[in-house]
Amino acid sequence: VADRTAICPGTFDPPTLGHIDVIRRAATMFDHVVVAVVRAPQHKMQPVFTADERIALLEDGLADLDNVRVRSFTTLIVDVAREEGATVLVKGLRAVSDFEWEFQMAHLNAELAPELETAFVMSYPDWSFVSSSGVREVAAFGGDVSKYVTPRVARELAAKFPQPSES
C-alpha cells in the first residue's frame, strides 16, 4: 500500500487549538500531512502574522509529530496537493456555517482536480466556537486567549497587540 498524504490548507492567522486538533487527528489517519499556509489570503484583510510567522507558530504547536510538515503556498491548493502527492484535502468544520463555504470549495476543487478528495473533520465541542478572527479580536482588546491557542501564540499575540497602560 502506498503512503497516503493529506494536505490541510488554511490561513491560520493565528493558528488556534482547534486547528492544531484537526491537524493532529489528520496525522493519525494519514502517513504524511502537509499543512499549507496561504501567503496572501485573497478574501481576508491583511494578516496579523506574516506567513513565515504563522509557519513557525504551527511548527511549534506540532513539533512532536514526525509525519507533519508545514509550508506556505501562493497558488491554487489543488496545484499544491499535486506537487506534494496529496490525495486528500482535510478541512475542519466547526458548524453548519463552515459547511456552506467548505462544501462550495470542495465542489470547485473536485472540478479542478477530480483525483483529490475532500475530507471534513468535525471539531470537538471544546473548539466549535473558536475562530482565528475571534481570537484576534479578544487579543486586540487585551483579553486572555490562553484557552484557545498555544502558549507561544498567546505570547506573540500579546506582543502584536500591546495594551496601553491605564492612567
Language-model features: locations:
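Nucleotidyltransferase catalytic core that binds NTPs
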Residues: 1-167
